[in-house]
Amino acid sequence: LDPESIKKQFDINALSPLCMTRSLINLFNKKSKIAFITSRMGSIDDNTSGSSYGYRMSKVALSMAAKSLSIDLIKKEIFVGILHPGLVSTRMTGFTNNGISTKESAKGLLERIDSLNESNSGKFLHANGETLPW
């Protein structure tokens, strides 16, 4: 374990998106949508492989911040997406053959963002539309 690396991941993946959103919040209008790209690796219920402590902890923290924001902002009719991009074939995943392309992931994420509304704001959603476990 490298505590400095974990702190850096937390700052980048959880704290920075929250701080940026709070700084910009007065610019959002009714029916605005805010998307947070988190990860299924931040799901406590779905963790079957362990490891990746810093990444997992930072992503679950981001999901919690986004969930809290969704509750705080619903009365202003601002909707919050908590989104997993899918297993994307990138350097981070070792360009896995099991992954989807960045284009396919982006398409799914945009569809989820477009469909954000009062009923699904604050839900943990996969780019393919599946609701994910916390």
Task: Map each language-model feature to its residues.
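Ser/Thr-centric signal marking residues that sit
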Residues: 21, 58, 90, 121
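Catalytic loop of short-chain dehydrogenase/reductase
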Residues: 1-15, 19, 25-74
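C-terminal helical subdomain
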Residues: 82-83, 94-134
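Rossmann-like NAD(H)/NADP(H) cofactor-binding core
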Residues: 35, 76-81, 123
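Short, well-ordered beta-to-alpha junction loops that form the rim of enzyme active sites
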Residues: 37-39, 85-86, 129
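Alpha-helix C-terminal capping segments
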Residues: 24-29, 92-96
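Short beta-loop-alpha junction of Rossmann-like oxidoreductase domains
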Residues: 43-46, 84-96
